[in-house]
């Protein structure tokens, strides 16, 4: 996603690109993300529901819990740290749908901090005078994008066949 920081993989050759694409298709690539989400996420959990284009706005995705539209999507999440009005979580994807983490977290009432497409900026723009209002305005100045990091990426090397695992640190704007 645009404005997501962290790791990504590219195939340098057609062979590598094809091999990596197959690994993503077969869901053997390990991907974990860190996200700051609104609210106190009380428990670790799993969000499961079809994800597809929203009926009212075709530029965003929506969750269809009965599976009437979209494609099957599963996101596992665990709480890393509670930080007042936001919670730092880790997400592990079983599937890889467009905006999957963003739409799944919105669906369970915990949109990503700073995500205007999925309700992550409403806490400031929609609640003037709130308890954390000045603090949050400063946070939006420091982190003017969705708080989502591609934290770990693991896959089999296309030529050597060995499993490779990469890890990235939280960017400075998410640490502040």
Features from the language model and the residues they span:
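RNA pseudouridine synthases
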Residues: 2-176
